[in-house]
């Protein structure tokens, strides 16, 4: 249940970011949640502008943790690849 809650928070944060900053009027987002052995993976794919969340940093003093920084903090790992003009992010818990 704990990992499901983490996955829900991460899915919401990443999806909101894609919708706000995807740079297109017709974005699409594909979200999959996979559980294999003891690893829970949230896989997010979108056709927005090229954006690597691993390279993102938010340095604003008003917030301790902000959006993608929150996802990085609560996940076990995060991977990204740009393939076939799509952003592919895999977040593990």
Q: For each of these PLM feature ranges, what is it?
A:
Residues 26-28, 75:
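Short beta-strand-initiation
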Residues 2-26:
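Conserved ATP-binding N-box helix of the HATPase_c
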């Amino acid at each position: 249940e704990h990992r499901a809650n983490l996955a829900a928070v991460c899915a919401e944060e990443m999806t909101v970011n894609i919708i706000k900053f995807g740079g297109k009027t017709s974005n699409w987002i594909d979200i999959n949640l996979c559980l294999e052995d003891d690893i829970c993976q949230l896989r997010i794919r979108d056709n927005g502008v090229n954006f690597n969340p691993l390279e993102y940093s938010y340095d604003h003093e008003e917030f301790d943790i902000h959006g993608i920084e929150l996802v990085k903090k609560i996940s076990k790992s995060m991977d990204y690849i740009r393939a076939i003009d799509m952003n592919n992010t895999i977040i593990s818990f």
